[in-house]
Every structure is written in C-alpha cells, then in structure tokens.
Amino acid sequence: MMYHIPGVLSPQDVARFREQLEQAEWVDGRVTTGAQGAQVKNNQQVDTRSTLYAALQNEVLNAVNQHALFFAAALPRTLSTPLFNRYQNNETYGFHVDGAVRSHPQNGWMRTDLSATLFLSDPESYDGGELVVNDTFGQHRVKLPAGDLVLYPSSSLHCVTPVTRGVRVASFMWIQSMIRDDKKRAMLFELDNNIQSLKSHYGESEEILSLLNLYHNLLREWSEI
C-alpha cells in the first residue's frame, strides 16, 4: 500500500530547509547507488560528509519520529539515515528497485520494507519530477506539496520522471518495519484508524477498549523486535 503523510514539516521548516540546502555541497547521486541503479540515475545528492548534512538529517528523523500518522502507517523499527536529492535540467532516475538490505551506522544492517520521500519543493515550482511507483494495484504518479511525505513498499519498481523546469528537492529514506508483511501492516493501520475515528466520535467505551486490546495483541503476535 501507498500512504500520503501530510505535514511532516511545516511551511516554515520547509523554507528553512530550502535556504540551507542552497548552501549545501552537492555531489553525483550515483555515489549511494548500486550497479543497477547507477545505470539509470542522473541526479545530485547532498554530500554526506558535510556538517550541514548531519544537522539536516537529524531534523528529518526528529520530524518523522514525532508524526503520529507516519508511526501508525510504518510501525518503524529502524530508520535509515535520510538523504537529500536534487533534480534539475532534465535530470531523472529511471525505473529501479531499492536494495533489500542497507548498511546502518548503529545496527549494522537493516531490511528495507518501506521507502519514503519527503518533498521539499512546491509542486508548482517545477515541471516533471513525478515519483512513479508500480505495484500490484497499478501505476501511481506522486507529486506532493512541500512538507508532505509518501510511503510505499520498497519492493515496488519506481522512478522519478525528468524535471524539465525548475528544481525538485526532496529527502528520502528507508524503513525496516516491526511488521515485515505489507498486508498485515495495512490491516493494523486500518484498524488503528478506525479505533481513532470511533474514539473521536463516541469517546471511550468498553467496545473501543476491546478493539484497542485486539490491535495490541495482533501487534504483539506479528511484530519482530
């Protein structure tokens, strides 16, 4: 399943990020890509050795970790270090698949269950640059407001179409979920959303408490910690 997570960054945070990224050191995006991806990748990324990068990636991690909808949809166990990319002048990233595992500075290795893109450019400021994701439900084209994030299974083939006008800037990362199976994770997310909706309409009740108990028992049964 694909999920739109709105308002991960406020407009003020986005503006500050963009101002700082104007001063960043950008390098060839292929430095973080395997052999298959390097053949179809043509973009730029912030140099991960820079002091600015260290500060910005920490801010992204803090923002997603504090976002309740992101947590409910991803049920994250491990987050990769966020990266930042930029597309302009017809730069693009052809169809590719993300690696199943990635190195992690604290955990050694992590499994990539979910991929996330946090948009940092207003969609009206550039042409092209859609994230295109192919999954079992068809093809999805994504171009979200700045500050919003999209989550999708890392097993999906995906690409970024050429940016023919303006500049597209984003942060991206991978998530190892506590729930490996996409279908089980989607069921838990739906159950959680329905519980929250019922609570907002009817307040606390024994029936809602019973559903909450069911949610946590399923999470306990399926989670890998």
Swiss-Prot record:
- Residues holding Fe cation: H96, D98, H158
Residues that bind 2-oxoglutarate:
R168
Lineage: superkingdom: Bacteria
Enzyme class at the top of the EC tree: oxidoreductase
> Would I find Ribosomal protein among this entry's keywords?
no
User: What NCBIfam families has UniProt attached to this entry?
Assistant: PRK05467.1-1, PRK05467.1-3, PRK05467.1-4
Q: What name goes with this protein?
A: PKHD-type hydroxylase YbiX
Q: Which organism is it from?
A: Escherichia coli (strain SMS-3-5 / SECEC)
What gene is this protein translated from? ybiX
